[in-house]
């Protein structure tokens, strides 16, 4: 998003030759966020490895802080946004099935939930 440090990702899908799902490792610098969206086809699982991942789900958004060792599942068609609202970089694993891309509907961003 404009004005924030870039996020980075590594494709686990490519490295492991996944066929029926997609997986990525993400790094979010301090105070960055992904785009708010809903995916009609894909269920997603998020697992923080380092730091607290904030996920806004539903509409109106509900804030869920996910710590390392916790897991959050976002079902198909559910509005969501992944965020790092901390002063430290976070690292998390994201897994989705089926392995579709390009169908997400992007939504207006919200400041706080």
Task: Go through each PLM region and give its residues.
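A short, N-terminal "cap"/entry segment at the start of jelly-roll beta-barrel domains
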Residues: 1-25, 35-36, 104-113
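Double-stranded beta-helix
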Residues: 3-6, 81-113
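A generic beta-sheet turn/junction motif
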Residues: 16-18, 29, 40, 59, ...
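Residue-level recognition of conserved beta-strand positions in structured domain cores
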Residues: 25, 38, 49, 57-59, ...
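A generic "binding-loop/recognition-motif" signal
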Residues: 32, 41-42, 60, 78-79, ...
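Short beta-strand His + acidic residue motifs that chelate non-heme Fe in jelly-roll/DSBH
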Residues: 35-36, 55-56, 64, 74, ...
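A short beta-strand-loop-beta hairpin characteristic of the jelly-roll/cupin
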Residues: 42-68
